[in-house]
């Protein structure tokens, strides 16, 4: 891990992922006292606000920017964080964007698993090793279910939210590797250098998540 670069200790740089998590992340941060109005249909990747810079990144890049100190903190799915292998501080489970990573096969498939296709090779290899399954892991970029349907792989490892895609394609979950949701992650050096900004944000987000859980309202 590289220490956070020298900047104004009162200025935060946040790494936020494009896509499904971004809107919910911005809403939750606003509730925590950081109102961030990101322009729609803008090609800008860096947004400046009073006391805060927001970097819009691809999901898998958020842990990298935080770990290497370019961003002080970020929000990213636990699945992406695990796959990145980055040693960042993870103080709050934000409890939105919930899903789980599963081993999936065609319904009724019973033969040995010799090849597994996935976007999550680190997680897949760890799971297979823990089960003593000597399968080849093939990394794909999308439409993972198709690998099981075409015979490219005997099984796939992929995220599942509702399971509707699996049912529509005659696929079923064999096992759950882990559950995932959005997490707040923090650069460890920044936690010391910008403690006055980061600690209140962490505590406020934690309070909001706990309150919403108690009220059964979700956190948005």
Curated annotation (Swiss-Prot):
Q: Which organism is it from?
A: Deinococcus geothermalis (strain DSM 11300 / CIP 105573 / AG-3a)
Under catalytic activity, the entry for this protein gives: 1-(5-phospho-beta-D-ribosyl)-ATP + diphosphate = 5-phospho-alpha-D-ribose 1-diphosphate + ATP
Name of the protein in question: ATP phosphoribosyltransferase
Localization: Cytoplasm
Which function does this protein serve? Catalyzes the condensation of ATP and 5-phosphoribose 1-diphosphate to form N'-(5'-phosphoribosyl)-ATP (PR-ATP). Has a crucial role in the pathway because the rate of histidine biosynthesis seems to be controlled primarily by regulation of HisG enzymatic activity.
Which Gene3D superfamilies does this chain map to?
Periplasmic binding protein-like II
The enzyme's E.C. designation:
2.4.2.17
Q: Which GO terms describe its cellular component?
A: cytoplasm
- Enumerate the GO terms in the molecular function aspect: ATP binding; ATP phosphoribosyltransferase activity
Matching entries from Pfam families are given as: HisG
Domain observations: Lacks the C-terminal regulatory region which is replaced by HisZ.
Keyword terms of this UniProt record: Amino-acid biosynthesis, ATP-binding, Cytoplasm, Glycosyltransferase, Histidine biosynthesis, Nucleotide-binding, Transferase
Q: Name one GO biological process term.
A: L-histidine biosynthetic process
């Amino acid at each position: 891990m590289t220490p956070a670069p020298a900047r104004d200790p009162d200025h935060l740089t946040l790494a936020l992922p494009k896509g499904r998590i971004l809107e919910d992340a911005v809403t939750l941060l606003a509730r925590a006292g950081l109102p961030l109005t990101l322009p729609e249909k803008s090609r800008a990747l860096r947004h400046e606000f009073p006391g805060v810079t927001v970097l819009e990144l691809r999901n898998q890049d958020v842990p990298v920017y935080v770990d290497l100190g370019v961003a002080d903190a970020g929000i990213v799915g636990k699945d992406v964080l695990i796959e990145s292998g980055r040693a960042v501080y993870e103080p709050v489970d934000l409890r939105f964007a919930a899903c789980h990573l599963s081993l999936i096969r065609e319904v009724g498939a019973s033969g040995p698993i010799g090849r597994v296709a996935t976007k999550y090779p680190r997680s897949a290899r760890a799971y297979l090793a823990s089960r003593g399954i000597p399968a080849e892991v093939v990394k794909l970029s999308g439409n993972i279910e198709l690998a099981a349907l075409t015979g490219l792989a005997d099984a796939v490892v992929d995220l599942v939210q509702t399971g509707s895609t699996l049912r529509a394609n005659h696929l079923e979950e064999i096992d759950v590797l882990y559950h995932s949701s959005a997490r707040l992650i923090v650069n460890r050096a920044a936690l010391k250098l910008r403690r006055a900004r980061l600690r209140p944000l962490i505590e406020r987000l934690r309070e909001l998540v706990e309150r919403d859980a108690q009220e059964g309202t979700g956190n948005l």
